[in-house]
Structures are given as structure tokens and as C-alpha cells.
Amino acid sequence: MLQIIPGLEVNPTARAAIEIAAALGAAGARALVACAGGRMEGELQAKGGVFVPFPSRTKSPLAMALNVRRLARLIAAENADIVHVRSRALAWVAYGATRLTKTPFVTTFPSGYQGSNPTALRYNSGLARGDAVLADSNFTAALIAKLHFPAAGKIRVVHQGVDRQVFTPDAVAPARVQAARRHWKVAPHERIVLLAARTRPGSGHKILIEAAGLLSRSGLAGVKFILACDRDEDSALERGIDRAIAAEGLQGIMCRTGPCDMPAALLAASIVVVPATEARAFGDAAVQAQAMGTPVIAANLGAAPETVLAPPMVEESSRTGFLVPPGDAAALALAIATVLSLGATASGKLSSRAKKHVETCFSAEHMCAATLEAYADVRRGGER
């Protein structure tokens, strides 16, 4: 079994590839991962995967054409039964190589690749050419079927999995939580509202800033708002966030910081907010926070209703978090105030339901089992 990904840097794509490699190894299969390498090579090999160096980051047409032949030779040399790819450029390379070798071809279609013009749609369509097309949510599956209709009959929903050995309260030492609070300069009596997201349009930073301003003016005290952002993104967006914080007069209660120890940050938080204004197919932060038992408030768009259960989609007794209209700072402020006012019993029940929801629907084990089932069906010819 051969997976091909851009690299083994620390990101959800590499994490998923490693989890699948481990599951394949446990099932007695040889799990190859071809890519440009990265910091997670050691973890891949420790979990039974085999790293195969491959120039997978190139996107130039000539280099991609050369990679088709290179990948076909690798497939033949390793006698790979199935090829699984997770990016657009690599999808075209793998499509060409697997047609040459007559090898089954599986793709995972990331949700962000919607395409806004014919050229983009054509480029993205490589991911829709798999013998099985894996979508990370029902939202993504519907989007693929709409934009790439020929793929509709080959789509399977395989939700991303959370590593519950990492994202569980028992795995986080109290010292890690205290270190996060010290880094953010949070006083012992203060509670934390955390937004952990990339600094990019659509992440909703300014919606939270506006909501925090409303809460501050209404007299809310004893709360610190933390924006944990990647610092390697658009600096103009970062400056815009800083200006918005200053305009609301929130410098004393809102802190923008860089990447953090995410499990510790989620456990330190009293609330995790995901106020996105653009639809995302799978919200890592929302699911990871629920795994930690931390209350989540998310914008009700994209796949949020799949990952965060809230009325009217479920009964109040089945709630695992809160959904608010996207772009509505007043609704977000009200939800934050509501969660902060929950008593210990209500908060404990919400936390237990959220953790159970993740265990049932979004575990790495669940993701791996569904993916291996897709491999088995494709190998039997069930998807071809």
C-alpha cells in the first residue's frame, strides 16, 4: 500500500498518513509513504511505516510529467496494490501513474478546494478521479458531488480522526497547563476564551474581537481572550487584527500569540471558539476541544453541525457544544456569556457528552477502519 503526500511536516495530512500507515502495519500490510520528508519521518517509521523519498512538492507541468513515470516505476518496484493521494498536484501524478500500472487509486479530497473558475475546477478534478474519493465530512461530500458530478457514485465520508492518546485530559500534565497560562500572562482567577486558528480571511478573528468588545462593555470581568495564531501567515492580516483589538480597547484582556502546546491550551481554556465566516469541512479545533472536554462555540456553517451537536439538530440533552450564526458577534457574545454562566453539573454533563461524541465518531481508530474498508472494496473492484 502506497500513500503519497507533499511532506511529513506537522500537519493534519501527515498525521492522517501516519495513522493509516500504523493501521496497515497492524493489519499485516507493508505501508509506504512517498513524499519530500519532514520532521515526522521518525514517527512514521516508529509506527511501522516506510518512508520513500519522492519529489512530491513540485507543481510545474514538466516536473509533474516526470513524476508520473517516476511514480509508476515505484509502484511497479514495490508491487503496490493501491495508491492513496491527498493533494491536487499529486492527484494528477498518481492518476497518470496508476493508469500506466493499472493500479487502484484512492484520493482524499480536502474541503478547501472548491474552485471558483473553470481552470481551478479542472485542476481540482484530479482528486475526483479516484476509484474511491474520500471526503472528510458530509458537507465536503455534497460539494464534491455538486462540482464534480462524475465522482458522485465513488464518494465515501471518512471523518478525520483525533489522536485520543494526545487529545485527552489524562495525557496533559498540570505543569503544561500552567506553562500555557504563564506564557499568556493569565492571572490565577481569570478564565480563558481561546481561538486557535490560522491567520487567514474567514477564520473569524474580528468577529471574536467584536464579541469581546460587547462583553467588556457589558461589564464582563475575569476573562482573558487568547488568539493563538500561526505567525507565518499574512502579516497584513495580523496588523489588521491588532488594530481591531486596539479599536475595541481590549489590549488588557485580549492577547494575540503564536502556535502553542495545543492539548494544554485546550485544557487550559474555559471555552474554545471557532467563529469562522467561511465554510470549513472539518474543524480540527472544535473536535480536539471536545475530546478534551472543553466547551465549544462554533459558527453554524460548513461541517460544524456534524462536529458540534446543538439544538435544533439534536435535543438539548444531546448537546455537545453551541452553534451561532456566522458573522454574528452579538450571538457569539451571548453564547460566551451563557457558557461562562454554566454551573458545575451542567458543565460536567456537556463535557462528558462532547468526549463521548468524539470517541464515537471522530477517533483515529474510526478513521483508519473506514479508510481500510475503502481500500478493501477498491481492491476487490467494488468501486471500479
Give the ranges of each region predicted by the language model.
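Acidic donor-binding loop of glycosyltransferase active sites
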Residues: 267-281, 294
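Nucleotide-activated donor-binding/catalytic signature segment of Leloir-type glycosyltransferases, i.e.
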Residues: 238-258
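Short His-centered aromatic/hydrophobic patch
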Residues: 85-91, 109
